Amino acid sequence: MGPSERPSIGWTPKEAEMQIGPQPDGWSRGWKPGDRGAVPLPLSPALSFLLLFPLASALQPTPLPFPELRLVGGPSRCRGRLEVMHSGSWGSVCDDDWDVVDANVVCRQLGCGLALPVPRPLAFGQGRGPIFLDNVECRGQEASLSECGSRGWGVHNCFHYEDVAVLCDEFLHTQPPTRKVLTSMAPATALQNGKGEGSVRLVGGASPCQGRVEILHGGVWGTVCDDDWGLQDAAVVCRQLGCGVALAATTNAFFGYGTGHILLDNVHCEGGEPRLAACQSLGWGVHNCGHHEDAGVLCAVLSPPTSTALPPSVTKEDWARHTGPAATGVGASPSRDTVWLTTAARASGKKSGRLRLVGGPSPCRGRVEVLYAGGWGTVCDDDWDFADARVACREAGCGPALGATGLGHFGYGRGPVLLDNVGCTGTEARLSDCFHLGWGQHNCGHHEDAGALCAGPEELGLQVQQAGSETTRMPSPRPRDGHLRLASGTHRCEGRVELFLGQRWGTVCDDAWDLRAAIVLCRQLGCGQALAAPGEAHFGPGRGPILLDNVKCRGDESTLLLCSHIRWDVHNCDHSEDASVLCQPL
């Protein structure tokens, strides 16, 4: 494991940096309800080594009573803003270092099943009163949050707009066996591309093209460790399985813990390899991981293509352009000469006003919502596939489809779930013309909201204009907290990074800014691959507040706000240090 990787015991680099030096009130590495004195816990070899130094005395566990926690402000007891009780009062938890591993512990403690992806900031509002915990760090196996590390009661550097929110799948333990469950471990439902050496399969996902990555070696199936796991690696897996482009590379056993051997670690794909086994790694069976680090993928196509699944008007050439190595979407390498050209003229469509895409980086990428009886509602991802996305994109006036998403990829909707088991041929004018169970008939929750990735009018216009037609640019949506934009560049995919927060636009300081942050931002904005991450106001100094500093990304985060950073508005910069990115335009 190289210097840039996180220690396998579960600490993040940020946490390790914080521990070398004086600690506020002592670093808590676990506590038990009812304890009053310091009770040392078993220490790993790495932590024992640190105890040889004088400063390490600050790392001794400080037992803290932790009788209760709750989720408030959400639609159910299993979804909301996290609060813990201390000394008779309820308080918030700060989101520094918070991830799905920590959320899984909370969900398990509450009897709420599996944690879903970490929601956007302020998803359930801001808390009031004290902030009790910060830098919570769980390994994933803990029975309760009280066994995880933290900085200690009341020690933090946060504000309430950093309050942790948690989404659990409360249906996990009550669903019938036939209903899809995120943690399904049955290999019988897994998609795999063969039984030969180097074959891969996805296990534990809600559809055949999502799940924990397992690979076959020496006749034995094993998992892949998430050290260095990223979107290029996921792209190879999705392509090997015929599942289109990669939407996300998941870490920290997002799709549940595997069993048996860990066969690959530090996988590094260039993105063009035909098989995962062709990528660089430490070698078969060489790793320093546990199954809490099992890698996974989410691919754009929910089900793999078959020779009989293509609608009459879709040629194999069209399908290959959307699912082959050159297909362009989130995280794929762009290829202008193969994407959209053959379908642009007949796929642009006219907006019906009865379907919209929301929650995404542009008006043509997002959660699918349909209008019925005067109200908007969502579509469940049961049977949702590329043909359905084609119709949704056409009805939205957004050109050809690039991919179909599920599992609430673009956030969780509100209100009714209006359609389920949608089955389109791909030629319908409206989504409501496709087969479905009937308006309002479903067995879903909003964690199953379907989405679509469309080429969009901007990109479509490049192709349509070549054919002698005209196109109209869609107006930009009104910004909301957390929205990002690139300013002063020559096109929409390069420029100075600006963030919208509290009804104002502000900039990002270039301290610690690097290509990994650019990768996250380019992906979030629906642009191509990150080319550079210049600092020093490369595109000129901005105005207004400097909202973020010391942004540190791994590169696989879904949004820039999930990267580690100093708390809002705290920095030591001026606008001569504004951060920028250059992304390859699509």
From Swiss-Prot:
Keywords: Disulfide bond, Repeat, Secreted, Signal. GO terms for cellular component: extracellular region; membrane. Residues 69-169, 200-300, 355-455, 484-584 form the SRCR domain. Residues 1-33 are annotated as: Disordered. PROSITE patterns: SRCR_1, SRCR_2. Its main location: secreted. Pfam families: SRCR. Disulfide bonds join 94-158, 107-168, 138-148, 225-289, 238-299, 269-279, 380-444, 393-454, 424-434, 509-573, 522-583, 553-563. It is found in: Secreted. InterPro entries: SRCR, SRCR-like_dom_sf. Residues 1-58 form the signal peptide. SUPFAM superfamilies: SRCR-like. It comes from the Eukaryota. This is Scavenger receptor cysteine-rich domain-containing group B protein. It comes from Mus musculus. The gene is Ssc4d.
